Every structure is written in structure tokens, then in C-alpha cells.
Amino acid sequence: MFCNVRLELDLPFAHSLKEKRRTVRSLKDRLRRKNVSVVESSNQDFWQRATLELSLAAVSLGAAEEKREEVRRMLVNYDEIMIADLREEFVKL
């Protein structure tokens, strides 16, 4: 079971591309520590917007939902970002 998530983020505290990259890099590092694959897919040139694509794998739907909820809690509690849009999709192979 795979879970794919597309995040549209607002970065209200970023005042330059350098600050945005620092924030996004920190967020990506935290997600990778939770065994989540992550890539910044668009909005690279906008300093207060970011679009991230996340993917995680699990052995069952229940485990994927649990991991996804853990990631969602971490994102909500991350002070430097605001979630503008979140789309998720579960894929069973």
C-alpha cells in the first residue's frame, strides 16, 4: 500500500528564497527521518509558497493511514508553515 500526498504550503515567515530553502530543507529532513520520500515539485522560485510531493509505503491500509496521520500531525505542529492545500491518494499494488 502506498500513500501519496501533495502539499501546497504557505511560508509566511520566509522573506527570501534563502529562508524558504532553509525552511523546506528542514521540513524535508524531518519527513525523511520518518521514512517518507519527499520532493519539492513546483513553486521553487516563489519565496512564500512551496509544493511538496510525499510518498510512503506500508504493508496495509491501516498502517498507511496511521503513518499518514503521524505525518499530518507533524506538519500541523510545524510552526514555520501553513498548509494551504493537502491532497492524498492511496494506491494498492
Regions found by a protein language model. Give the residues of each.
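Short amphipathic alpha-helix segments
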Residues: 18-37
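A short linear hydrophobic-aromatic micro-motif
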Residues: 34-42, 84-85
